[in-house]
Amino acid sequence: MKAWLLVSSLCLSTFIAALEQTIISTAAESISRSLHTTELEFTWIGTAYLLPAAASTPPWGKLSDIFGRKPVLMISIVVFFIGSLIGALAINIDMLIAGRVIQGTGGGGILGLSATVIGDVFSPRERSKYYGVLGVTWGVACGLGPIVGGAFCQYVSWRWCFWINRTSLPQSSPNPLNLTTSVPVAGVAGALVLLFLEVHTPRTPIIEGLLAMDWLGTITIVGATVMFLLGLGYGGIAYPWNSATVVCLIVFGIGDNRRLRPDRMEGRQVLDHAAAPVQIPPPISPPSASAYIHGLRLHRPTLYYPPAVLSRSCSAPPRSLSGVYLLPVAVTLCVASTATGLYISHSGRYRPPIYFGLVMMILGHGLYINLQPYASWARIIIFQIIAGLGLGPLFQAPIIAIFSLTKPADTASAAATVFFARDIATAMSIVFGGVIFQNRIRAFKSDIEGVVSPELTELITSGGATTASDQIRALPAAARSLVRDRYNTALRSEWIFYTALSGAALLLSVFISKQVLSRDHKMNKTGLDVQEASRLEELEKEKKAAATDAV
């Protein structure tokens, strides 16, 4: 009972963070119209949450190593709450993006630390069962997020996508859905964590702990990630791909991220309390790569664009219905995640679910290439079910594989590795998808301008493709059919790209080391003394390895 209360507190925390990744998918068009955004700004409505969620994961993990999991998780929930408040009060796109950035910073800590706590508390065999529960929580958030976001946009306002995380909603807000004026989602999550999360919490002095942090490494990770994704987002849209701005952002974004170089990842260099001190053996690289491709495949093609695209295929359906379109993949994902957790808990083997998930991802998302510019419901539902069967097992299996190969002191760093890879891939997925789609649709400018007005043609091909759905539905049948066909062709390029990435992940997964998970476990401890002992142990190993090489 105690274990399930603990997991319940983590699940609710995970739910609010995961919900904000998907609730925007059906609200983005309303936000774009309300705040008058360009296509590039539209893309950053989603990326502004996902980017800091990825970049903040390593420092959140290191802070929890120093100060303990519970207080740092509580702080991340508070940060998430503040970001939600700013987003709800946004009067322009800059303020909204600022709120999403703060939200994402807190969300990155919530998701990463929830997984870390399970790794601390439970044995390798038991972890899989509870990670399955977290996977179901994420799946429920995936399913409810677009529906709730669409309902808010249709009946109240997109701002309620942010008010929902407050401990109270404004009394003056319209309430046709008969929702209560008190929605204590973030508040209840924080209270449950405070009451039921019983883990080792060291008494680390605040100043000493902060001085032990690798702030230079933290700034490097955040700065490099932002530069890289800005370069990808600007390429071909705001600036030409060969412009100095785009080239410099991408090159320096990759080059400056020294803290995550492979030599550091493999433990050949050990830094004092580094922001990403993942001294883990090389065999974990394929699981991290699988998690990366999983994140890259998940968000854009499965959760972000289909609601908007499918709504264009129908006769102006309500926005709440476009979220229902995602239920097949969300429900199947939950079932697959639960089954995977039970299988790993029973057998102790994590490689078969990874292989199965990647094969189904290739099949399911490869079938998306066959989607038509009209509502072919048999295709839409069956293809999503197959994709969900592939996505579900990959929520927990890669992190279980990594935890099985790491020391207890490196649990947070291992979780940070997986979630950094997954979150940065999710953010990159939106950027990659936007770049591929926008550049492809621009190639059809001559076709489109022959059937629609020059103004609408320019809107569709020069930055407003996603926000032009109302104008497209108002076109004559022949013109509407041509534009939808070009939309579908542009999206097909995305499906091909993501399917190829899934194949690359399957090839990498072959190199995952084979182990049978143990049922034995000892509670992990945190604090500077534990981290220092682990660091000295790594240094001693390096000295012995160097001496052996010298001989």
From Swiss-Prot:
Pfam families reported in the protein's UniProt record: MFS_1
InterPro entries, alphabetized: MFS, MFS_dom, MFS_trans_sf
Subcellular location: Membrane
Induction: Expression is positively controlled by the cluster-specific regulator ATEG_00326.
Leader sequence segment: 1-18
Gene Ontology CC terms, in alphabetical order: plasma membrane
Membrane topology recorded in Swiss-Prot or TrEMBL: Multi-pass membrane protein
Gene Ontology molecular function, alphabetical: transmembrane transporter activity
Main localization of the protein described in the UniProt heading: membrane
Regions crossing the membrane: 40-60, 71-91, 102-122, 132-152, 179-199, 206-228, 233-255, 324-344, 354-374, 380-400, 417-437, 493-513
Keywords: Glycoprotein, Membrane, Signal, Transmembrane, Transmembrane helix, Transport
Glycan attachment points: 165, 178, 524
UniProt record similarity statement: Belongs to the major facilitator superfamily. TCR/Tet family.
Task performed by this protein: MFS-type transporter; part of the gene cluster that mediates the biosynthesis of isoflavipucine.
UniProt name for this protein: MFS-type transporter ATEG_00331
Lineage of source species: Eukaryota, Fungi, Dikarya, Ascomycota, Pezizomycotina
